Amino acid sequence: MDKKDSLRLENQLCFPLYACAREVVKAYRPHLEALGLTYTQYISMMVLWEEGQVSVRDLGKKLHLDSGTLTPLLKKLESKGYLKRSRSTTDERVVIACITEEGRKLKRAASKIPQAMTQEMSDFPMEDAQNLYALLYKLLGMLEVSNEKQDFSKKNK
Protein backbone atom coordinates (compact mmCIF):
# COMPACT_ATOMS: atom_id res chain seq x y z
CA MET A 1 0.00 0.00 0.00
CA ASP A 2 1.47 3.35 -0.97
CA LYS A 3 1.29 6.48 1.20
CA LYS A 4 -1.70 7.84 -0.69
CA ASP A 5 -3.69 4.66 -0.02
CA SER A 6 -2.69 4.50 3.63
CA LEU A 7 -5.04 7.38 4.45
CA ARG A 8 -8.08 5.83 2.80
CA LEU A 9 -10.82 5.02 5.31
CA GLU A 10 -11.29 1.46 4.08
CA ASN A 11 -7.58 0.76 4.70
CA GLN A 12 -7.79 1.61 8.40
CA LEU A 13 -8.09 -1.25 10.90
CA CYS A 14 -9.57 1.17 13.41
CA PHE A 15 -12.60 2.02 11.29
CA PRO A 16 -14.32 -1.39 11.07
CA LEU A 17 -13.58 -1.90 14.78
CA TYR A 18 -15.17 1.46 15.57
CA ALA A 19 -18.16 0.86 13.29
CA CYS A 20 -18.76 -2.66 14.62
CA ALA A 21 -18.58 -1.45 18.22
CA ARG A 22 -21.22 1.18 17.45
CA GLU A 23 -23.46 -1.36 15.70
CA VAL A 24 -23.14 -3.86 18.55
CA VAL A 25 -24.13 -1.19 21.08
CA LYS A 26 -27.03 -0.24 18.81
CA ALA A 27 -28.18 -3.89 18.72
CA TYR A 28 -28.13 -4.04 22.53
CA ARG A 29 -30.07 -0.77 22.89
CA PRO A 30 -33.68 -2.08 22.72
CA HIS A 31 -32.92 -4.80 25.28
CA LEU A 32 -31.21 -2.35 27.61
CA GLU A 33 -33.78 0.42 27.22
CA ALA A 34 -36.37 -2.03 28.56
CA LEU A 35 -34.25 -2.15 31.74
CA GLY A 36 -33.50 1.58 31.76
CA LEU A 37 -29.78 1.01 31.17
CA THR A 38 -27.17 2.23 28.75
CA TYR A 39 -24.59 -0.20 27.39
CA THR A 40 -21.87 1.24 29.65
CA GLN A 41 -24.13 0.91 32.69
CA TYR A 42 -24.88 -2.67 31.65
CA ILE A 43 -21.23 -3.71 31.42
CA SER A 44 -20.55 -1.98 34.75
CA MET A 45 -23.32 -4.02 36.32
CA MET A 46 -21.91 -7.17 34.71
CA VAL A 47 -18.69 -6.65 36.68
CA LEU A 48 -20.67 -6.16 39.88
CA TRP A 49 -22.76 -9.27 39.18
CA GLU A 50 -19.52 -11.24 38.83
CA GLU A 51 -17.62 -9.76 41.76
CA GLY A 52 -20.21 -8.35 44.17
CA GLN A 53 -18.00 -5.41 44.98
CA VAL A 54 -15.07 -3.74 43.29
CA SER A 55 -12.98 -0.63 43.73
CA VAL A 56 -13.97 2.14 41.34
CA ARG A 57 -10.37 2.24 40.13
CA ASP A 58 -10.37 -1.48 39.29
CA LEU A 59 -13.77 -1.17 37.62
CA GLY A 60 -12.44 1.61 35.41
CA LYS A 61 -9.40 -0.46 34.47
CA LYS A 62 -11.47 -3.52 33.68
CA LEU A 63 -13.90 -1.57 31.49
CA HIS A 64 -11.30 0.79 29.98
CA LEU A 65 -13.19 3.82 31.34
CA ASP A 66 -11.71 6.95 32.88
CA SER A 67 -13.02 8.46 36.10
CA GLY A 68 -14.73 11.28 34.18
CA THR A 69 -16.98 8.70 32.53
CA LEU A 70 -17.25 6.27 35.43
CA THR A 71 -18.18 8.67 38.25
CA PRO A 72 -21.43 10.00 36.73
CA LEU A 73 -22.31 6.51 35.50
CA LEU A 74 -21.94 5.07 39.02
CA LYS A 75 -23.90 7.99 40.51
CA LYS A 76 -26.76 7.17 38.13
CA LEU A 77 -26.67 3.46 38.99
CA GLU A 78 -26.55 4.34 42.68
CA SER A 79 -29.55 6.68 42.31
CA LYS A 80 -31.45 3.75 40.77
CA GLY A 81 -30.56 1.64 43.81
CA TYR A 82 -28.42 -0.91 41.94
CA LEU A 83 -25.20 -0.25 43.83
CA LYS A 84 -23.83 1.55 46.84
CA ARG A 85 -20.53 3.43 46.89
CA SER A 86 -18.49 3.79 50.05
CA ARG A 87 -14.95 4.50 51.15
CA SER A 88 -12.70 1.56 51.93
CA THR A 89 -12.23 0.95 55.65
CA THR A 90 -8.53 0.25 55.08
CA ASP A 91 -7.76 3.15 52.72
CA GLU A 92 -9.93 6.28 52.67
CA ARG A 93 -8.71 7.13 49.16
CA VAL A 94 -10.33 4.02 47.71
CA VAL A 95 -14.01 4.05 46.74
CA ILE A 96 -15.77 0.69 46.62
CA ALA A 97 -18.87 -0.04 44.53
CA CYS A 98 -21.00 -2.80 46.03
CA ILE A 99 -24.05 -4.42 44.45
CA THR A 100 -27.39 -4.07 46.26
CA GLU A 101 -30.40 -6.37 46.35
CA GLU A 102 -31.98 -4.21 43.62
CA GLY A 103 -28.83 -4.78 41.55
CA ARG A 104 -29.20 -8.52 42.02
CA LYS A 105 -32.83 -8.30 40.90
CA LEU A 106 -31.65 -6.43 37.81
CA LYS A 107 -29.37 -9.37 37.00
CA ARG A 108 -32.38 -11.65 36.86
CA ALA A 109 -34.14 -9.20 34.53
CA ALA A 110 -31.04 -8.92 32.31
CA SER A 111 -30.33 -12.65 32.19
CA LYS A 112 -32.08 -13.09 28.83
CA ILE A 113 -30.04 -10.44 27.01
CA PRO A 114 -27.01 -12.61 26.09
CA GLN A 115 -29.25 -15.28 24.56
CA ALA A 116 -31.28 -12.65 22.68
CA MET A 117 -28.07 -11.13 21.29
CA THR A 118 -26.78 -14.56 20.26
CA GLN A 119 -30.07 -15.13 18.45
CA GLU A 120 -29.84 -11.75 16.69
CA MET A 121 -26.35 -12.62 15.46
CA SER A 122 -27.18 -16.21 14.53
CA ASP A 123 -26.23 -15.64 10.88
CA PHE A 124 -22.63 -15.09 12.02
CA PRO A 125 -21.07 -18.58 12.26
CA MET A 126 -20.04 -19.63 15.78
CA GLU A 127 -16.52 -20.54 14.62
CA ASP A 128 -16.09 -17.05 13.15
CA ALA A 129 -17.38 -15.51 16.38
CA GLN A 130 -14.90 -17.54 18.45
CA ASN A 131 -12.01 -16.61 16.14
CA LEU A 132 -13.00 -12.95 16.21
CA TYR A 133 -13.24 -13.02 20.00
CA ALA A 134 -9.73 -14.50 20.27
CA LEU A 135 -8.27 -12.04 17.76
CA LEU A 136 -9.88 -9.03 19.46
CA TYR A 137 -8.50 -10.02 22.86
CA LYS A 138 -5.08 -10.64 21.30
CA LEU A 139 -5.17 -7.16 19.72
CA LEU A 140 -6.44 -5.60 22.96
CA GLY A 141 -3.61 -7.17 24.96
CA MET A 142 -1.00 -6.00 22.46
CA LEU A 143 -2.41 -2.46 22.45
CA GLU A 144 -2.52 -2.34 26.26
CA VAL A 145 1.18 -3.25 26.44
CA SER A 146 2.06 -0.74 23.74
CA ASN A 147 0.08 2.04 25.43
CA GLU A 148 1.62 1.25 28.83
CA LYS A 149 5.09 1.55 27.29
CA GLN A 150 4.16 4.91 25.74
CA ASP A 151 2.72 6.15 29.05
CA PHE A 152 5.85 5.00 30.89
CA SER A 153 8.20 6.72 28.44
CA LYS A 154 6.18 9.98 28.65
CA LYS A 155 6.39 9.95 32.45
CA ASN A 156 10.14 9.40 32.39
CA LYS A 157 11.04 12.19 29.97
Located regions from the model:
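Pre-recognition alpha-helix immediately N-terminal to the DNA-recognition helix
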Residues: 16, 23, 43-46, 105
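Charged, amphipathic alpha-helical coiled-coil/dimerization segments
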Residues: 25, 75-137
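Short capping segments at the starts of secondary-structure elements
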Residues: 51-55
